[in-house]
Design a protein with these regions (language model features):
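Exported/periplasmic cell-wall-interacting domains
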Residues: 62-188
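Surface-exposed loop/edge segments in extracytoplasmic proteins
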Residues: 20-26
Length: 188
């Protein structure tokens, strides 16, 4: 199992390998536009704290203003994966919650709030519309609000795509744990 932990209060995303060692650390924003219905975690709002599964990734060549170098799909932690993690000793049931790597949270929450998936992405199309305009494809672009997923700097996302590519190919389980509520950013 690879464990990706998004600590929204700190604005940070950490990637831990199967042995628990830190592989990658990056700035991240979990702030959403907040314009959607079904608050506080429905479409247009931030993802609920808890455990999720990374489902796959798409690499863009060339990068796009919306996603930067690519996007990583995030879905609810399904019952089969949850059972596999418990049976392997990688997770424990704690009442209604699940403990993974000493972090306790609910398993998923997307479906509960009318979502099927969200993404981890780079880019930020609003940057090109600012005065003066900023480059959404810059390696360390300003992190802007999204539709509720997580946004990384393009350089960090490019590295994360490289790190996770073999794991997706080998069908390694990749868990995303989202901690806390999002920080507030100044861009819509």
């Amino acid at each position: 199992m690879i464990h990706v932990v998004a600590e929204r209060r700190l604005g940070r995303l950490a990637v831990y390998g199967p042995d628990g060692h830190l592989w990658h650390l990056a700035d991240a924003s979990g702030e959403a536009r907040g314009a959607g219905m079904r608050a506080p975690y429905g479409p247009g709002n931030p993802i609920a704290p808890g455990h999720y599964r990374l489902l796959g990734q798409v690499e863009h060549d060339p990068p796009t203003a919306e996603d930067g170098p690519g996007a990583i799909d995030v879905g609810d932690l399904d019952n089969t994966t949850r059972r596999r993690l418990i049976d392997a000793g990688r997770a424990r049931v704690r009442g209604d919650a699940l403990e993974i790597a000493s972090l306790t949270g609910l398993a998923g929450g997307l479906a509960e709030y009318g979502r099927t998936a969200i993404v981890i992405r780079g880019g930020g199309t609003i940057l090109a519309h600012l005065t003066p305009p900023e480059d959404p494809l810059a390696p360390y672009q300003r992190l802007t609000r999204s539709d509720g997923g997580l946004r990384l700097h393009n350089a960090d996302l490019a590295r994360l795509l490289i790190i996770l590519k073999p794991a997706f190919k080998d069908e390694t389980t990749i868990v995303l744990t989202v901690l806390g509520e999002p920080r507030r950013t100044s861009l819509h």
